[in-house]
Every structure is written in structure tokens, then in C-alpha cells.
Amino acid sequence: MMNKNKKLMVMAGGTGGHVFPGLAVAKQLQQQGWQIRWLGTADRMEAELVPKHGIEIDFIQVKGLRGQGLMRLLKAPFQIVNAILQARRHLLTYQPDAVLGMGGYVSGPGGIAAWLLGIPVVLHEQNAVAGLTNQWLAKIARRVFQAFPGAFADASVVGNPVRQDVVQLAAPEQRFATRNGAIRILVMGGSQGARILNQTLPAVMAALGEGYEIRHQAGKNSQQDVAEAYAAAGVESAQVTEFIDDVADAYAWADLLICRSGALTVSEVSAAGVGAIFIPFMHKDRQQALNADHLVACGAAKMIEQPELSVEKLTQMVRELDRAQLLSMAQKARQAAKLDADKVVAQAIIAITE
């Protein structure tokens, strides 16, 4: 059934972990005739990324409050009210049938403004620990979804919306069927890179010696330094890039992924069907470690928390994994995947607006 006159405003920003899942849901609704508009901030990644997907974006001025100085905290109530009023103006102009909050600072004022106008609010929490904004908005939302168990006591667990090119990869047993020779290691630190991975992996690869290939995504402005570190360690064959343009192709190539455990990364690893060693970013609520827990528990991944990371420990962990074990991990990752989160969330939005 087409919904030619229905409109959704997606509220998401700051990081790819919020924006990409929002785009996945938006595409599902566009295929059913919905009009989509975005609410974001002008100085974060959504300002450039969202229009590339053919979606118009409105901006409000809002920043996070954690770790701010006294003057910023004193000004905060006025800034929040101003952001709510800005969001309200955009909502009154666009007149959406529902709003979808995917997290990030922009979701707070946008969600409150929508609620005050009587517009249904739908939330999706990508992490195993709910962000502050979503904790607040969950009290006023019509539907709340979570990617992993534990963020909310009574929200539906649906996984994270994942890009279709990742979902559509061949099954691990097909990819591994003709592989022999060197174990293929993919290192990903996100768009900004992960300094600890950039510092540790050249020495790990040197210690592992022959029998391994590596592709290393080093992040913004780090490619040359990391490439030089590999060369200095005597690892001449390392392929070091700043970004990976085709992530699905990189997952398909890899036998083993070494990476952080941000919400979207964990969901993509599972959807792709790749065995992983997670090195969670240190955070006081252990958010990334908790994101990875379910894949570790089912045998699809291993984890070394950052305070315990050493060249020796990571080298030993990699050395213990042969291709048969990596195939088993990849199969378990794929079996654990929830591949229809975008469809489930889109269907809920349709249902509450009928």
C-alpha cells in the first residue's frame, strides 16, 4: 500500500551510528511513497551526508552539555528552549505525520517540539546503553525500539538498520569456499580512526610474521603515519587507507575484523557474517563493550578491553584463529543478525499514522 501523502521527519545527527540507520528507515518509507525530511545541525556530518541521499534537511542550533564549563551550563536552559522553538518552526512548516528520533543532540529538542504539537514520536536506540536524549524521549514516545537488549526494560529488540549492500553479501561458507593461503585481516577504526589500533597493529603484524594479509583503515589524517609505522616494523605489504569507500566489499574480503564496537559496527559485522576481535572504546558506562557482549557470548567474536590490550595479547589471540575457526565465527555472526530492523521500524511508523 502506497502512502503518497504521508510525511516523516527524521531527527538524527552527530555520528554515522545515528545517521546511517536513520537513512535506512527513510529509504524503506520512501519506497512506500512517503516524503522524508531531516532535522539536524549544520556543523555535523548529517549536513553533508543527508543531502547526498536526496533528502532535504533543516537545521537547529544545539550542542551537548556533558563536560561543559559553568557558563555553558548556565546558558543551557535558554539554548534548549531556543532549539525547541527552532524545531517547532520547522515542524509547523513541514507538517509531518510522525517523527523518528535516532539519537544525537538534535533529537531532544525535535522530539519535545513534536510531542508538544501532538505529532507521534518513534525512537530507535542503537546502543546497549541508552543515550541521555533517548532516556528522556522514551517517556513521551509512542513506540521505542532498541538494537540490543538492556537499553530499555520494555522496548522491542529489533537490531540496527543496516545498509542493504552489507545485508546482501554472500553467506560466509560461500565466501570462504575457495580461500586458501594468507589469513586476511581487516582493521577498521571508524571515520576518525582509532589511535590505539593505529599504534598497536603494526607491531602485531610484525610479530605474526608470514601467513597474514592486512588492510588497515587508519582514519582522517592518519594514513601516512600508519603506513610509515608498518614499513618501520618491516611489514611491507600492508594496505593502509584513510577511509573505506566500499565497506561491504571490505567485509566480503576479510577473514577477521579487528575494530571498535560501536553499535553500527557490531550490527554490520553480524549482518555481513565476519568473525571479529573487538577493542571497545573506553567509556564510563562500558557502552561499546556491552554492544559487543552478545556476539562474544555466542562465539561470533572475541573482545579485549582497552586497558588489557597489548601487542602480545592481541598477537596470541589472532595466532590462535585458523580459517576453519574464523568461518565458524562468521557463521555464528550471521546467525545472530537481525536483518529487518529498517522494515520493522518503518512498519511501526506506518501503523501509528493510519
From Swiss-Prot:
It is a peripheral membrane protein. It comes from the Bacteria. It is found in: Cell inner membrane. Belongs to the glycosyltransferase 28 family. MurG subfamily. Its EC number is 2.4.1.227. NCBIfam families: murG (TIGR01133). Pathway: Cell wall biogenesis; peptidoglycan biosynthesis. Cell wall formation. Catalyzes the transfer of a GlcNAc subunit on undecaprenyl-pyrophosphoryl-MurNAc-pentapeptide (lipid intermediate I) to form undecaprenyl-pyrophosphoryl-MurNAc-(pentapeptide)GlcNAc (lipid intermediate II). It catalyses: di-trans,octa-cis-undecaprenyl diphospho-N-acetyl-alpha-D-muramoyl-L-alanyl-D-glutamyl-meso-2,6-diaminopimeloyl-D-alanyl-D-alanine + UDP-N-acetyl-alpha-D-glucosamine = di-trans,octa-cis-undecaprenyl diphospho-[N-acetyl-alpha-D-glucosaminyl-(1->4)]-N-acetyl-alpha-D-muramoyl-L-alanyl-D-glutamyl-meso-2,6-diaminopimeloyl-D-alanyl-D-alanine + UDP + H(+). It is an enzyme of class 2 (transferase). Pfam families: Glyco_tran_28_C, Glyco_transf_28. This is UDP-N-acetylglucosamine--N-acetylmuramyl-(pentapeptide) pyrophosphoryl-undecaprenol N-acetylglucosamine transferase. PANTHER family: GLYCOSYLTRANSFERASE, UDP-N-ACETYLGLUCOSAMINE--N-ACETYLMURAMYL-(PENTAPEPTIDE) PYROPHOSPHORYL-UNDECAPRENOL N-ACETYLGLUCOSAMINE TRANSFERASE 1. InterPro entries: GlcNAc_MurG, Glyco_trans_28_C, GlycoTrans_28_N. One of its GO terms (biological process) is regulation of cell shape. GO terms for molecular function: UDP-N-acetyl-D-glucosamine:N-acetylmuramoyl-L-alanyl-D-glutamyl-meso-2,6-diaminopimelyl-D-alanyl-D-alanine-diphosphoundecaprenol 4-beta-N-acetylglucosaminlytransferase activity; undecaprenyldiphospho-muramoylpentapeptide beta-N-acetylglucosaminyltransferase activity. One of its GO terms (cellular component) is plasma membrane. Keywords: Cell cycle, Cell division, Cell inner membrane, Cell membrane, Cell shape, Cell wall biogenesis/degradation, Glycosyltransferase, Membrane, Peptidoglycan synthesis, Transferase. UDP-N-acetyl-alpha-D-glucosamine binds at residues 15-17, 127, 163, 191, 244, 263-268, 288.
